[in-house]
């Protein structure tokens, strides 16, 4: 991911040096288990731990690996050679009985686990901001729109409550996907443990609080990674849904809410008046990326026989970029919603703009329930006057009052056009969330 869209945590997490630190953690964990079983000298493991703590792998080590790999054309071989040069004779026990993918896949799971943890925290923060705004605007009336057209009154807080509920489901998916990669694979070249005991894998997994992969070939099955990418892609659609709503609400014709606009900020190089929804447009773009990463992740599932490396080049891009994109976009949207500028007066004005058309269903029910009219006849009266209101701009209540076929009295019309009728169950909805 380019630096422009990297959070500080993701930049460190997906650095080359940190990748090699994860590789070393796998190697040392395996070595520790092997030492317990007398397969390698315990003092070799102890010495390597001491040296790695005193001289941790850094950017210089990553550059050293790159230089060796330019000759070997094999990253794990370059890694183990660089370890030997850095830590000395004891490093010869590194990689004992393992194959490259044992280290790469298990270490990649360490990085994915940490990345998913960061994203889950980000989403929890976004959810809390939605809860805060839902509470603040619980009783702020706004017109609900279906197909982009005014439908019926609702409250602005219900939008946030809907988003909060969706984020709860996202969190469930993210947690499940994170668990799917909390597995250790140390099973050898084709998954038969030919040169390493299954006990080593099991003990490493237990020491991390993870599980040993029950069966593998040379790689972990890529449906696990696809599930991670799917959870991130679905999160992206949630972020996009929220972002698109804010973009629509900021339109000049609507202007019910808008992104924060900082002091000194400019909206256009040529039009000084512009305040564009650039932050939520940015989030929309990340959602598109996340769906694209998923498509590639699904392609990676079907590998040849016990493995090929067609997935490798793709994963080196999509896993860091997908997790980085999800984290960045979530944090960006969190900032937008936290500092969202809301215009309740404009919301009321927009509610009134169509001259009461948003109350048409209440009138329909009054004719059916209170006056005993057949639905078709009642619908005809309301629709005829509603269409006239669309065409002339006259208020629906005034048109109905003047319609000789309308049996509703002034008091009954007042009741039908009562805004609070539409909002009377808002408290019940909030109660489902303990609010």
From Swiss-Prot:
Cross-referenced InterPro entries: AdenyloSucc_lyase_C, Fumarase/histidase_N, Fumarate_lyase_CS, Fumarate_lyase_fam, Fumarate_lyase_N, L-Aspartase-like, Pur_lyase
What EC number(s) are associated with this protein in UniProt? 4.3.2.2
What's this chain's function? Catalyzes two reactions in de novo purine nucleotide biosynthesis. Catalyzes the breakdown of 5-aminoimidazole- (N-succinylocarboxamide) ribotide (SAICAR or 2-[5-amino-1-(5-phospho-beta-D-ribosyl)imidazole-4-carboxamido]succinate) to 5-aminoimidazole-4-carboxamide ribotide (AICAR or 5-amino-1-(5-phospho-beta-D-ribosyl)imidazole-4-carboxamide) and fumarate, and of adenylosuccinate (ADS or N(6)-(1,2-dicarboxyethyl)-AMP) to adenosine monophosphate (AMP) and fumarate.
* Pathway(s) where this gene product acts: Purine metabolism; AMP biosynthesis via de novo pathway; AMP from IMP: step 2/2; Purine metabolism; IMP biosynthesis via de novo pathway; 5-amino-1-(5-phospho-D-ribosyl)imidazole-4-carboxamide from 5-amino-1-(5-phospho-D-ribosyl)imidazole-4-carboxylate: step 2/2
Q: What family is this?
A: Belongs to the lyase 1 family. Adenylosuccinate lyase subfamily.
The organism named in the record is Deinococcus radiodurans (strain ATCC 13939 / DSM 20539 / JCM 16871 / CCUG 27074 / LMG 4051 / NBRC 15346 / NCIMB 9279 / VKM B-1422 / R1)
Q: Does the keyword Lyase apply?
A: yes
The record's active-site residues are: 147, 268
Q: Which reaction does it catalyse?
A: N(6)-(1,2-dicarboxyethyl)-AMP = fumarate + AMP; (2S)-2-[5-amino-1-(5-phospho-beta-D-ribosyl)imidazole-4-carboxamido]succinate = 5-amino-1-(5-phospho-beta-D-ribosyl)imidazole-4-carboxamide + fumarate
Give the top-rank taxon of the lineage listed in the UniProt record for this protein.
Bacteria
Residues the record lists as binding N(6)-(1,2-dicarboxyethyl)-AMP? 4-5, 73-75, 99-100, 218, 269, 274-276, 282, 313-317
Q: How does it assemble?
A: Homotetramer. Residues from neighboring subunits contribute catalytic and substrate-binding residues to each active site.
Answer whether the UniProt record assigns the keyword Iron to this protein: no
| UniProt cross-references to PROSITE patterns, sorted A to Z | FUMARATE_LYASES
**Gene3D superfamilies annotated for this entry?**
Fumarase/aspartase (C-terminal domain), Fumarase/aspartase (Central domain), Fumarase/aspartase (N-terminal domain)
Official protein name in the record: Adenylosuccinate lyase
């Amino acid at each position: 991911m380019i630096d422009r869209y990297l959070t500080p945590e993701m930049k460190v997490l997906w650095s080359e040096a940190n990748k090699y630190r994860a590789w070393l953690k796998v190697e040392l964990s395996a070595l520790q288990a092997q030492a317990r079983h007398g397969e390698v000298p315990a003092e070799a493991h102890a010495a390597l731990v001491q040296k790695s703590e005193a001289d941790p792998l850094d950017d210089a080590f990553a550059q050293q690996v790159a230089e060796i790999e330019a000759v070997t054309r094999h990253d794990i071989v370059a890694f183990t050679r660089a370890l030997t040069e850095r830590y000395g004779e004891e490093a010869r026990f590194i990689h004992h009985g393992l194959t490259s993918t044992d280290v790469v896949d298990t270490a990649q799971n360490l990085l994915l686990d940490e990345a998913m943890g960061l994203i889950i925290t980000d989403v929890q923060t976004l959810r809390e901001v939605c809860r805060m705004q839902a509470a603040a605007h619980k009783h702020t009336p706004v017109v609900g729109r279906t197909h982009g057209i005014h439908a019926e009154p609702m409250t602005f807080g219900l939008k946030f409550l809907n988003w909060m509920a969706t984020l709860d489901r996202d969190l469930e998916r993210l947690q499940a996907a994170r668990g799917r990669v909390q597995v250790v694979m140390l099973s050898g070249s084709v998954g038969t443990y030919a040169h390493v005991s299954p006990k080593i894998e099991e003990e490493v997994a237990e020491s991390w609080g993870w599980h040993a992969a029950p069966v593998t070939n040379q790689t972990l099955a890529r449906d696990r990674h696809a599930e991670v990418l799917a959870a991130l892609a679905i999160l992206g659609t949630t972020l996009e849904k929220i972002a698109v709503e804010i973009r629509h609400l900021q339109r000049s014709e609507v202007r019910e809410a808008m992104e924060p606009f900082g002091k000194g900020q400019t909206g256009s190089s040529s039009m000084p008046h512009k305040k564009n929804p650039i932050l939520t447009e940015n989030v929309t773009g990340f959602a598109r990326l996340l769906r694209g990463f998923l498509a590639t992740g699904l392609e990676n599932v079907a590998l040849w026989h016990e493995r090929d490396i067609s997935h490798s080049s793709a994963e080196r891009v999509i896993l860091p970029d997908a997790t980085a994109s999800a984290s960045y976009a979530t944090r960006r949207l969190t900032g937008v919603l936290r500092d969202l500028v809301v215009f309740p007066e404009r919301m009321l004005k927009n509610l009134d703009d169509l001259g009461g058309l948003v109350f048409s269903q209440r009138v329909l029910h009054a004719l059916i329930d209170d006056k005993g009219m057949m639905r078709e006849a009642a619908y005809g009266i309301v629709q005829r006057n509603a269409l006239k209101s669309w065409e002339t701009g006259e208020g629906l209540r005034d048109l109905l009052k003047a319609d000789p076929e309308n049996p509703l009295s002034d008091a009954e019309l007042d009741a039908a056009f009562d805004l609070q009728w539409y909002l009377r169950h808002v408290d019940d909805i909030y109660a489902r969330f303990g609010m």
